[in-house]
């Protein structure tokens, strides 16, 4: 009740939504998160489906199809493909922009940002700036799971630490890219971990 009261006092009772299409460009991933039912990477060969890595033309086709169906945004995410570089991510954004100058591109988790900038040997700021210049509009705050390192050590030990994740999000804001933030719960966390995540 208190949370709703704060929300109403801050934002009123208006509710909005976005018509969005999620485009997963690859399910090939070098990470091995314990909870993932999506990845076709290490230790995940038994999961349903085959590995895929879709082409730029397919990303464009799906974007154009989304626009025809009334979407105003595409969200792009995928596994951390071992052969992807930062240029791969930039080129995906450019491919979409070659097809539409108006669709909102909401793409790449902090984990993808970290992977991309490392492959190019540049800072997080520089990489995010290049993505924005290519046409990126905002970042999804995924790969957050629970922003508590005790939990992350159990469910995703090879992912970014809580502080690393937060620094990438803060840097995105400095570049002028708004972000969201997600929380995955119902696994090994307790309510103090959830509270800590929300406070961050």
PLM regions and their residue ranges:
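N-terminal pre-triad scaffold of radical SAM enzymes
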Residues: 2-43, 51-77, 139
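Short, well-ordered coil/turn segments that N-cap beta-strands
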Residues: 9, 13-15, 70-72, 100-105, ...
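Active-site mouth loops of central-metabolism enzymes
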Residues: 21, 39-57, 111-123, 154-158, ...
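Active-site loop-helix segments enriched in His/Asp/Glu that coordinate
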Residues: 45-61, 81-98, 123
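Generic structural signal for well-ordered alpha-helices
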Residues: 60-63, 89-94, 128-129, 166-169, ...
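Conserved strand-turn element in the central/C-terminal portion of the radical SAM core barrel
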Residues: 74-84, 105-116, 147-149, 156-157, ...
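Active-site-adjacent beta->alpha loops and helix N-cap segments on the catalytic face
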Residues: 82-96, 100, 150-165
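Catalytic cores of alpha/beta
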Residues: 122-128, 188-200
């Amino acid at each position: 009740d208190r949370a709703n009261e704060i929300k109403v006092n801050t934002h009123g009772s208006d509710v909005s939504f976005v018509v969005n299409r999620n485009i997963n460009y690859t399910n090939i991933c070098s990470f091995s998160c314990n909870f993932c039912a999506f990845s076709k990477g290490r230790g995940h060969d038994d999961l349903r489906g085959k590995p895929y890595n879709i082409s730029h033309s397919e990303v464009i086709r799906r974007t154009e199809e989304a626009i025809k169906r009334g979407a105003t945004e595409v969200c792009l995410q995928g596994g951390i493909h071992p052969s992807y570089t930062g240029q791969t991510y930039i080129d995906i954004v450019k491919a979409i922009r070659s097809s539409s100058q108006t669709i909102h591109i909401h793409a790449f988790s902090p984990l993808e940002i970290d992977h991309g900038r490392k492959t190019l040997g540049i800072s997080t700021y520089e990489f995010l700036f290049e993505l924005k210049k290519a046409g990126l509009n905002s970042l999804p705050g995924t790969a957050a799971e629970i922003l508590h390192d005790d939990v992350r050590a159990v469910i995703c030990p090879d992912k970014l630490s809580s502080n690393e994740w937060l620094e990438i999000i803060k840097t995105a804001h400095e570049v002028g890219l708004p972000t969201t933030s997600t929380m995955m719960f119902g696994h090994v966390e307790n309510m103090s971990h959830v509270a800590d995540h929300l406070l961050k």
